[in-house]
Amino acid sequence: MALNIRVMAPNRIVWNSEAQEIILSTNSGQIGILPNHAPLLTALDIGIMRILVNGQWTSMALMGGFALVDNNQLTILVNEAEKASEIDPKEAENNFELAKQNLAAAEGRKQIIEANLSFQRAKARLDAVNASSRLG
C-alpha cells in the first residue's frame, strides 16, 4: 500500500505521485507519514520534505504551508516548493552564506525578522540539496 502525495504551490503542482513514506518539517518538529496514518491536519514550517519512492529517497525544500492526511491521501499546500534536483548546489551554498551574513548584520526588529526568514529559506534549499546527495 502507498500514499498518494500531492504537493501544490499557488502557481503549479510540484509533486503528484505515490510514495511509501514522507518526512515533513512541521511547526512542532519533524513527522513521518506512512500508509494508513491517522487523519491529520498540520502546519508546515520552512524546511525539507523527504519522500521515499520505490526504495529511493528524494527531497524538496518547502517554504511553509499545510498538510492534510486522510485515507492514504496526503495533500500539501505550500507557499513555495523546490525539488532538490532543481536546485543548483553552488547557488544554494552562496545564498546560504549571504543569508547568514545578512542575519548577523541585521539591526532592528523588522530587519532581523526579514533576515531570519531569508536565512531559513536558504537553509531549507541547502538542506534539500545535501539530503538528496546523502540519501540518493
Swiss-Prot record:
GO terms for molecular function: ATP binding; proton-transporting ATP synthase activity, rotational mechanism. GO terms for cellular component: chloroplast thylakoid membrane; proton-transporting ATP synthase complex. Transmembrane segments: none annotated. Keywords: ATP synthesis, CF(1), Chloroplast, Hydrogen ion transport, Ion transport, Membrane, Plastid, Thylakoid, Transport. The keyword Cell membrane does not apply. PANTHER family: ATP SYNTHASE DELTA/EPSILON CHAIN, ATP SYNTHASE EPSILON CHAIN, CHLOROPLASTIC. Produces ATP from ADP in the presence of a proton gradient across the membrane. This is ATP synthase epsilon chain, chloroplastic.
